[in-house]
Amino acid sequence: MPKYVFVTGGVVSSVGKGITTAAIGRLLKSRGLRVALMKLDPYLNVDPGTMSPYQHGEVFVTEDGAETDLDLGHYERFTDENLSRASNVTTGQVYSAVIAKERRGDYLGGTVQVIPHITNEIKARIRQVAELHRPDVIVVEVGGTVGDIEGQPFLEAIRQMRREEGRRNVLYIHVTFLPYIASTGEVKTKPTQHSVKELRAIGIQPDVIICRTDHPVGDDVRAKVALFGDVDEDAVILLPTAETIYEVPLMLERAGLGRYVMEHLGWDDRDPDLADWERMVERLKSPRRRLRIALVGKYVELHDAYLSVVEALRHAGLAHDVAVEIVWVNSTAERSEIEAALRHVNGIVVPGGFGPRGVEGKMLAARYARERGIPYLGLCYGLHMAVIEFARNVLGLCGANSTEIDPETPHPVIDLMPDQRGVEMGGTMRLGRYPCQLVPGTKAALAYGESLVYERHRHRWEVNNAYREAFEAAGFVVSGQSPDGRYVEIMELHDHPWFVGVQFHPEFKSRPNRPHPLFVAFIGVAKHVLREGEQRPLPLAEPVAMPAADD
């Protein structure tokens, strides 16, 4: 029977519960335990698949094709474990399931209520992870903040879990924030006291309180939190802001959290195997040089919209002992602004996306990289932008486009597959893990060092095979495809240092100690392209003609 660790948050949102949950998973795995992690999201959406990145950040795709919360990306990167759709539960999923059961008559005509029906469904989904993954321990993050009305059923469900599973099999960890008052030079504990008080009013007594802080905190603060929170002093963990998120497991271990969790759950503590992790963090904090990589997208104001891409670039930089500095380039900006940003970068990444807004800037970036020999990595939509730009400016296909952008284009170089036509959004995309057969001798094959790989997808539109021969004749070749030859998965330029576009999302599979080979190869070329500080002359490229359009 598995044991459970529940992580809640108080005082403010975005306090760091996701990183804390991932770090706890790392600490327990380093002690030889089989670990599973999951996120309970209180919002009413079924999943974040159709939510705006401005609202939610990136959508993280699991191996089995679930569109999930970005925190699952942290979980996978920290624990190096592939999660499943069962690892992300939303209020929308829970209510949909309960209502469907009521319609089928599963409740035998009874009155359907939040307690017990909604809470029972939540508990069943938590236990489903235990059945699927057979872990020793499940670490569960409860989204939102204590006091949010939509989170109440989830808190009630985890309260009941301790009663049903036994006190020694359930641990509650509460993550709070200690605000700093500059005028008095004090760190205040009162918000944490009230947050714990509210949690206790629900019936949950936290076993551990983790206090996030941006300023040094003394032992007197720890003692005060322990007194008002009714926990042991060594169960109050002071967690200052880290230089890198990957340092958090080491900070929590030094604070004694790993030992405390093991002892509370009735296990003998073991020495954690964190040597590789410590070396990785040390290298992250002391790189030999810096690279500037342009990330060209339309949601750059919210960096979380491209979280996995940024982390994958940093992982690849670690493999080459360089620090990757992201140059955020808004693809909706004026051409002159985009050009100015691209003058002094070592490489360009155009990440995934949807819709027509900002495509002009993305294609300008693709053309600049192609014409100037600058390393380019196009991810999903980034491949589409490179294909359209090449079709127009090299193949001479006037008006070439994607039918996603222009349904009436005379040259649909990017198009829906026939079986996708007429299907509405929401659960209709090509999602999850699919095989890709690599062409021997290509840059992609050399990067992977394998002939068959599996990658995660999230898209509806594909490269149109009707134009494949024309592209290959001009040097833009297919270097990876589905084993049946139906789908183009990777394209690359023959006569270019590194110009590769992929239909999938390799960033979802990158880990700090196991960076993705495509990102490693990209950074490996980029670090030889441009000396630090050097600038290229303007103009960079002629503008790409695109019709004005909005999302």
Curated annotation (Swiss-Prot):
ATP binds at S14, V15, G16, K17, G18, I19, D71. Residues 1-267 are annotated as: Amidoligase domain. CTP binds at S13, D148, I149, E150, K188, T189, K190, P191, T192, Q193, K224. PROSITE patterns: GATASE_TYPE_1. Allosterically activated by GTP, when glutamine is the substrate; GTP has no effect on the reaction when ammonia is the substrate. The allosteric effector GTP functions by stabilizing the protein conformation that binds the tetrahedral intermediate(s) formed during glutamine hydrolysis. Inhibited by the product CTP, via allosteric rather than competitive inhibition. Residues 292-532 form the Glutamine amidotransferase type-1 domain. UTP binds at S13, K188, T189, K190, P191, T192, Q193, K224. Pathway: Pyrimidine metabolism; CTP biosynthesis via de novo pathway; CTP from UDP: step 2/2. The keyword Ligase applies. L-glutamine binds at Y54, G353, Y381, G382, L383, H384, E404, R460. It comes from the Bacteria. CDD domains: CTPS_N, GATase1_CTP_Synthase. InterPro entries: Class_I_gatase-like (IPR029062), CTP_synthase (IPR004468), CTP_synthase_N (IPR017456), GATASE (IPR017926), GATase1_CTP_Synthase (IPR033828), P-loop_NTPase (IPR027417). CTPSs have evolved a hybrid strategy for distinguishing between UTP and CTP. The overlapping regions of the product feedback inhibitory and substrate sites recognize a common feature in both compounds, the triphosphate moiety. To differentiate isosteric substrate and product pyrimidine rings, an additional pocket far from the expected kinase/ligase catalytic site, specifically recognizes the cytosine and ribose portions of the product inhibitor. Belongs to the CTP synthase family. Homotetramer. This is CTP synthase. It comes from Thermomicrobium roseum (strain ATCC 27502 / DSM 5159 / P-2).
